[in-house]
Amino acid sequence: MLNRNQKYDLHTIILNSKSLRKHHIKEEDVIHLKGDVKEHFYELKIVKEAHNMAFKKCTVEEGLQLRDLFNGEGNIFTTSFHINEDKSELSQLFIDNCIEKGVSAVPHLVYNGASSLLTIDVNGEEYEISRKRLNGLSNYIKSVYSTGDLLEPQDHIFGKIHPSRTFQRTLKKYYMFMKRISELLDN
């Protein structure tokens, strides 16, 4: 049985059940995630618009948290919220934000059509968003992104496992984007 306090490579924790005997690991220590089967383990995949994350080492408890985070399917947003067929940059950022934040249950936001579009400039990048969508996002943004502390890597499960500079820059970019939208809503 794996020591729950010791850190292991993630692929040692996420194992194909066929290799349990070989590694002397009990069923309760195995994390089954939807992904590509390579040799004797599942490679963690975050599907659709989300980024693939490269994890280094984590404890069994952290691994179990990851399993719970992805509902055992590697995909949190199919049952959490809907963004219709919108492939806009905002939708991708919104989905990525939820996943990067580790949000397993977010408000059900279903957008039906678009009204007049607003152009938002975020650090030199322009995004289009409808007023209707801004209103729909307001409660979520204000509650989850009200303080920057929520996005600090040390308070974040992904940050604890993989606190890379790239990861921190990504968090900052997403936070600044959502903060800018929040400011527009307040004006």
Swiss-Prot record:
Induction: Up-regulated by phagocytic stimuli and growth on bacteria. It comes from the Eukaryota. This is Uncharacterized protein DDB_G0275161. It comes from Dictyostelium discoideum (Social amoeba).
